[in-house]
Regions:
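Short, glycine/charged-rich "phosphate-handling" switch motifs in NTP-dependent
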Residues: 233, 245
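Conserved structural motif at the start of ABC-family nucleotide-binding domains
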Residues: 13, 32, 96, 284, ...
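ABC ATPase NBD coupling module
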Residues: 71-72, 85-102, 128, 250-255, ...
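A short, proline-enriched helix->beta-strand linker immediately N-terminal to the Walker B motif
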Residues: 179-183
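Conserved ABC transporter NBD signature motif
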Residues: 72-84, 351-359
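Helix-to-loop junction immediately C-terminal to a conserved catalytic motif
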Residues: 63, 343
């Protein structure tokens, strides 16, 4: 394992030879084995590795959120500003969580309470840790939503999680995590479920807020594109162990461990590869399809004006036999609607979908059934 680059600042967090044990009969003894690293103020340390490598369990151990008794801490130290959190009382850990160390989870829809308004959830975090009047808490909540660049903060305060987009829910989670200006922010794959445009915005936001609040960020991910964007240092985990750690430049551009080298080689390149020519023999042709979603209008046209969303507007694509066609775009661009129209889960407003010379738009359910099976 390469040596860890020392930080000029005194570490906020020091993980020293941490061991987290798995239940008997598991494939390996430890979920986390002999893990050591530090995190300094204003530093972003990215922890990367495939699923099951121990990234998230290390973070949960820091927060005192291991799924005990089946998965439990065995030995090692977790030093937060010199205090060993493995020896902290449950009451002390509750003070640390949210107040001094906060966490952003991968899927805010499961982390947020679905039956509580966003404002009430932020208020709950503030009320638990500090003494402020209701008006002061409300002003702080509004300020936090402004900081994470959510539109119309008063409306967001009154909204339920399901009424927000995925990116808005993640921003609300970040607002909650930063409510008490924690010294450490743990981000557990917070952009995985987001489209690339929203992901880029969230990464910029985390960097801006980190600099503003002098926060150390422990960023857990499997995406080397994210690592290249934000990391100061990188720790690579495999089978519960750190196999390589160093500056982002050294790990990404000059990896020394075979596993890290394999991970970096697996990152798709934007340089076009030499590909086998594909004959111009379309197996599928989508010709000028239109699909519009309509909502509103109320009963007998007495409600709000009808709204129209043009999900697919004159879309034309073709797919040759033996060819792979990639369709990309941000959330709401019409990718999934196009796919659903092709398999006739949605009816198009106009256009043709021709498969092997047959227009699928003219087939009934019985005619489509053998094509779907």
């Amino acid at each position: 394992m390469s040596k860890q680059t020392p930080s000029a600042a005194e570490p906020l967090l020091t993980i020293d030879q941490l061991h987290v044990q798995l239940p008997k009969g598991s494939e390996r003894t430890y979920a986390v084995e002999n893990v050591s690293y530090t995190l300094a103020p204003q530093e972003i340390l990215c922890v990367v590795g495939e699923s099951g490598s121990g990234k998230s369990l290390t973070a949960r151990a820091i927060m005192g959120l291991l799924p005990e008794p089946h998965v439990h801490y065995e030995k090692g130290q977790i030093l937060f500003q010199g205090e060993d959190l493995t020896k902290a009382s449950p009451n002390r850990l509750r003070q640390v969580r949210g107040g001094e160390i906060s966490m952003i989870f991968q899927e805010p829809m499961t982390a947020l309470n679905p039956v509580m308004r966003i404002g009430n959830q932020i208020d709950e975090v503030i009320r638990f840790h500090v003494k402020k009047s209701k008006r002061e808490r409300q002003q702080l909540a509004l300020s936090l939503l402004e900081d994470v660049q959510l539109p119309d903060p008063p409306r967001i305060l009154k909204a339920y999680p399901h009424e927000l987009s995925g990116g808005q829910r993640q921003r609300a989670m970040i607002a909650m995590a930063l409510a008490l200006e924690p010294k450490i922010l743990i981000a557990d794959e917070p952009t995985t479920a987001l489209d690339v445009t929203t992901q880029a915005q969230i990464l910029v936001l985390i960097k801006e807020l980190q600099a503003k609040h002098n926060t150390g960020v422990l960023f857990i991910t499997h995406d080397f594109g994210v690592v290249a964007d934000i990391a100061d240092r990188v720790a690579v985990m495999q089978h519960g162990k750190i196999v390589e750690i160093g500056s982002a430049d050294s790990v990404l551009n000059h990896p020394t461990h075979p596993y890290t080298q394999a991970l970096t080689r697996a990152v798709p390149s934007l340089i076009p590869r030499s590909v086998k020519p594909v004959e111009d023999n379309p197996i599928l042709e989508v010709k000028s399809i239109v699909k519009t979603y309509r909502s509103g209008g109320g009963w007998f046209g007495m409600g709000a004006p009808e709204k129209e969303v043009h999900a697919c507007d004159n879309v034309t694509v073709s797919l040759n036999e033996g060819e792979t066609l990639g369709i990309v775009g941000e959330s709401g661009s019409g990718k999934s609607t196009l796919a659903r129209c092709i398999v006739r889960l949605l009816d198009t407003d106009s256009g043709e979908i021709v498969y092997r010379g047959q227009d699928l738009c003219k087939l009934d359910r019985a005619g489509m059934r053998p094509l779907r099976s």
